[in-house]
Amino acid sequence: MAAESTATAAITAELVSADKIEEDAPAPSTSADKVESLDVDSEAKKLLGLGQKHLVMGDIPAAVNAFQEAASLLGKKYGETANECGEAFFFYGKSLLELARMENGVLGNALEGVHVEEEEGEKTEEESLVENNDNIDEEAREELREQVYDAMGEKEAQKTEDKSLVKPEMDKEQETEMEKGGREDMDIGEPAEELQEKVKSAPDQLTETTEEGKGAAAPEGLSEAEVTSKKPDQEIPGAEEGKSVSETDVQEECREKGGQGEVIVSIEEKPKEASKEQPVVTLEKQGTPVEIEAVKPVDMGGDEPKEQVAASESERGKAILEQLVGQELPSAEESPEVTTQAADASAAEAGSEVSEKPGGQDTVLPQDGAVNGLSAAGDHASTKPQTNAEGLIGTKDGSALEKVRAELVPSQETKLSVEESEAAGDGVETEVAQGATEQSPEDKVKIAANEEAQDKEEQMKEGEETEGSEEEDKENDKAEETLNDSALENKSLQENEEEEIGNLELAWDMLDLAKIIFKRQDTKEAQLYAAQAHLKLGEVSVESENYLQAVEEFQACLNLQEQYLEAHDRLLAETHYQLGLAYGYNSQYDEAVAQFSKSIEVIEKRMAVLNEQMKEAEGSPTEYEKEIEELKELLPEIREKIEDAKESQRSGNVAELALKATLVESSTSGFTPSGGSSSVSMIASRKPTDGASSSNCVTDISHLVRKKRKPEEESPRKDDAKKAKQEPEVNGGSGDTISTGTEVAENMEEEAENKAESRAAVEGTVEAGATVESTAC
C-alpha cells in the first residue's frame, strides 16, 4: 500500500509540474513577433551604423542607400511619424544633402563609383605580360635579330620562287597568242584569194550588162572593166586603226577636188550582216554626197523591170556578190526618185575604192562586199553592178584615183532625184543631182541627232529633277519625323523630371519630418537633434538660394543650441558661421561680420578651455593638442570671410550712393534749387544781351525789309536815323550797357535814394527805367 501511495504521489507531482511549465511558456505568435521586432531593430541599427561609416568615409551614394533602407524598415514597423524613425530620417536627409552638393558642385567627384584602382591594377598586369626592352640581355637581343633576319630571308626566297613560276606561264601565254595570230592571218588570206578569183570573173558580166543598158544611144562606153581586189591586211590605215571618217571630211575632200568632176563613193557595213542587209552606196559628185540603199526594188517610174540585188555571207563573214543585175534607167526627161535608207553602222569599217581611167577601164578595189554602181552615157543611163564594199567613181578626162572613207548614219532616209545625164566628148560623165530640198541630208541627220540628244538631255534633267524633288521630300519627311520624335522625347523627359523628385526636395522633406519628430520630445538629446535638423534645413535653403528661409532656420537652430549647450561648444561656432554665410549671400554684410566675429569668439573660448583641461590632465595631452590645432586652422578662414564681407560692404555702399545719386538726379531734374538758380542766371544773362542787342535786332529787321523793298531808297536813311536815336537812349543814363540783372537792381536802388536830391538823379532813374523796359520787351 505504501508503494502504491508513493507512485500516485509521484504521478500527481509530475502532472502539476507539467501544468506549471505550460502556463509559463509564452504563446507561439507573440514569440515570433518579438523575434521579428528584434531583427528589424537590430538590422536598422546596423544599417544606420553602416551609413554613418560610409558618410564619414565619403561614400555618399552607399550612405544614402543604407539610410534609406533603415528608414523604410523602421517606417514599416513603427510608422513614419514614430519617434523611433527620427534618427533614420535625419541621417537620410543629411546624406541626400551631401549627394545633392556633390551633383551640383563644380568640384564634385565625376568619377564616383568608377573603380580606378582596379583598372590600374589590370594595366600593370597586362604590362607585366609584355616583355620590357630594358630587361633583355645582349644575347637575347642577338637571338632575336637572327630570327628576324632568317624570317626576312625566307620571305625573299618565296618571292623569287613566285616570280620564277610566273615567268614561264607568261611566256607560254605569249606563244599561244602568237600562234593564234598566225592562224588568223592564214585564215584571212584564204578568202582574199577567193575574192580575187570571183571578182576577176565578174568583168564579162559587167560588159554584158553595160552593153544592154547602152543600146544604140551610147556609141562610146566602157570597153573593159578590171576588177582587182586587195587583201584585208592591206586595208586603209584609218580602218586599221579603228578610226571612223566623218561625213564632213568626205565633203571637204570632195569640195577641194570638185573641179575634176570626181564622184566618190564609200560604204561601211557589218561583215556579218551583209547577207541580211541590202547594199548601201554613197555617191558624191562635186561635193554633193548621196546615200543609196537598195532595200526594196526601185520604182523607176515606168514599166521597166524591177530586179533585186542579194548578197550572201562567206565562210569568214565576208559578203561576196553572187548575182549581178543591171537596171535600166528611164530617159533624161524623167526624174525617178530613189528612196535610200542607211543601215546600222558597225565597228568593222570597209573602205572601198573604185576608179575610172581615161581609157575607159574601171578599177575596183573590193574589201568586204559587192559594189552596185550607176553610170550613164548619152541619152540613157546604164547600170553597173558593184560589191557592197565598193563605190563607183565617175571621172572626167583622166582624173586621178581618189580614196575617201565615210561613215554611214543609221536609220537615215533620203529622197534623191536622178536628173538628166549627158555624155560629152570622149569621156563618160555622170551627173547626179539632188532633189530640190531645203536642207541637205547631212544637215537633216545632224539636226535629227541634235534633237534626239536634246530630248535625251531634257529627259535626263527631268528625271534628275524628279529624283531630286523626291529626295528633298524624303529628307523633309525625315526631318519632320526626327523633330516629332525629339519633341516627344523632350516631353517624356520633362514628365519624368516632373515625376522624379530632386535630392534637395527629398532631403528637405526628410529633415522636416525628423525636425517634427524631435521637437515633440522633451529630452535634451531630441532637442539637440531638432537643432541639427534646423541647421541642415538652412543648408538646403542655401543650396536652393532661398537665403531668407536659411537665415530663419539657422536662427532657430542657434536658439535651441544656446539653451542646451555651453558657450564654448563648437556647434555654436558652426551655427554662427553658417548664419554669417547666409547673411553675406543676402547682402546683409553688417550682420554677417557680427556672426563671423561671434564664431571666432566661441572658438577662442573653446581653445582656452582646452588649454586648461590640458594643464589639468595628468596623462598625454595629445587629444587636446589635436583639437586646438584644428581650431587654429579654422580661424584664418573665418577672418578671411570677415575681410571679404567688409570689402563687399564698402563696395556695396559706394554702389548704393552712386545709384541714389543717379536716381535723385533723374527724379529731380529741373526742379532742384540749383536748377532754379541756373534758370534764373540764364534769364539774367538773357536780359542784358537782349537789351544790348535791341538795336541789332532793329538793324536785322531793317536788313530784311531792305531786301524785300529794293526800289525804295528812303529805307536805309530811316534805319540810320532810328539807330542814332536809340543809341543815346541806351548809353545815356549809365554810360555803359547793363551786363547783369544785379547791376540793374543796384542802379535802381541808388537812383530811388537820390530822387529828392537832384534832377539829374531823377533823369538818371528815368533813363534806367527806360532801359529796363527796353530789355524786358
Curated annotation (Swiss-Prot):
Residues 152-186, 227-259, 267-276, 303-319, 710-728 have a biased composition (Basic and acidic residues). Residues 117-128, 211-244, 458-501 are annotated as: Histone-binding. PROSITE patterns: TPR, TPR_REGION. GO terms for biological process: blastocyst development; CENP-A containing chromatin assembly; DNA replication; DNA replication-dependent chromatin assembly; protein transport. Keywords: Acetylation, Cell cycle, Coiled coil, Cytoplasm, DNA replication, Isopeptide bond, Nucleus, Phosphoprotein, Protein transport, Repeat, TPR repeat, Transport, Ubl conjugation. Residues 152-496, 667-777 are annotated as: Disordered. GO terms for cellular component: cytoplasm; nucleoplasm; nucleus. GO terms for molecular function: histone binding; histone chaperone activity. It holds the Pfam family SHNi-TPR. A motif (Nuclear localization signal) lies at residues 705-711. It is found in: Cytoplasm; Nucleus. The modification N6-acetyllysine is found at residues 34, 243, 285. Residues 342-353, 667-681 have a biased composition (Low complexity). There is a cross-link at residue 725 (Glycyl lysine isopeptide (Lys-Gly) (interchain with G-Cter in SUMO1)). Residues 484-493 have a biased composition (Polar residues). The keyword Cell cycle applies. TPR repeats lie at residues 44-77, 531-564, 573-606. The keyword Ubl conjugation applies. Its main location: cytoplasm. Residues 593-648 form a coiled coil. Residues 464-474 have a biased composition (Acidic residues). Binds to linker H1 histones. Interacts with histones H2A, H2B, H3 and H4. Interacts with histone H3.3. Interacts with histones H3 and H4; NASP is a histone chaperone that stabilizes and maintains a soluble pool of histone H3-H4 dimers. Interacts with ASF1A and ASF1B; the interaction is probably indirect and mediated by H3-H4. Also binds to HSP90 in the cytoplasm. This interaction stimulates binding of NASP to H1-6/H1T. Component of the histone chaperone network. Binds and stabilizes histone H3-H4 not bound to chromatin to maintain a soluble reservoir and modulate degradation by chaperone-mediated autophagy. Required for DNA replication, normal cell cycle progression and cell proliferation. Forms a cytoplasmic complex with HSP90 and H1 linker histones and stimulates HSP90 ATPase activity. NASP and H1 histone are subsequently released from the complex and translocate to the nucleus where the histone is released for binding to DNA. This is Nuclear autoantigenic sperm protein. It comes from Bos taurus. The gene is NASP.
